[in-house]
Amino acid sequence: MPRPALRSRSLRRVYVKLPSGKTVIHYERKRNDIAICAICKKPLHGVKTNFLHKYSKSEKRPERPFGGYLCSSCLTQLIKATVRQQLQ
């Protein structure tokens, strides 16, 4: 039975075969998926995906409105649409 900290499903199980032929389980942190834009579903550039706990908040995503949520092209379209709507 693994120790209680390793029973959690937040850790991914990797089966490793040793030179002796014995198979053991190694526990690793799960990898994060690539961040995608909420509108066009393209992958976001400038958003880190690995070991997020090691980075500060400003390093994890771009420092702009909707950074880490929308890509730059969708953001420009959104800003233009809101400005045009305000002018009417």
UniProtKB/Swiss-Prot annotation:
What Pfam families does this protein map onto? Ribosomal_L34e
Q: Name one GO molecular function term.
A: structural constituent of ribosome
UniProt keyword terms in alphabetical order: Ribonucleoprotein, Ribosomal protein
Any GO CC annotation of this UniProt entry:
ribonucleoprotein complex
Name the InterPro entries on file: Ribosomal_eL34 (IPR008195), Ribosomal_eL34_C_sf (IPR038562), Ribosomal_eL34_CS (IPR018065), Ribosomal_L34e_arc-type (IPR047868)
- Which PROSITE patterns did the record assign? RIBOSOMAL_L34E
Q: Which GO terms describe its biological process?
A: translation
User: Which family is this protein grouped under?
Assistant: Belongs to the eukaryotic ribosomal protein eL34 family.
Q: What name does this protein carry?
A: Large ribosomal subunit protein eL34
The organism is Saccharolobus solfataricus (strain ATCC 35092 / DSM 1617 / JCM 11322 / P2)
In the UniProt record, the gene name given for this protein reads rpl34e
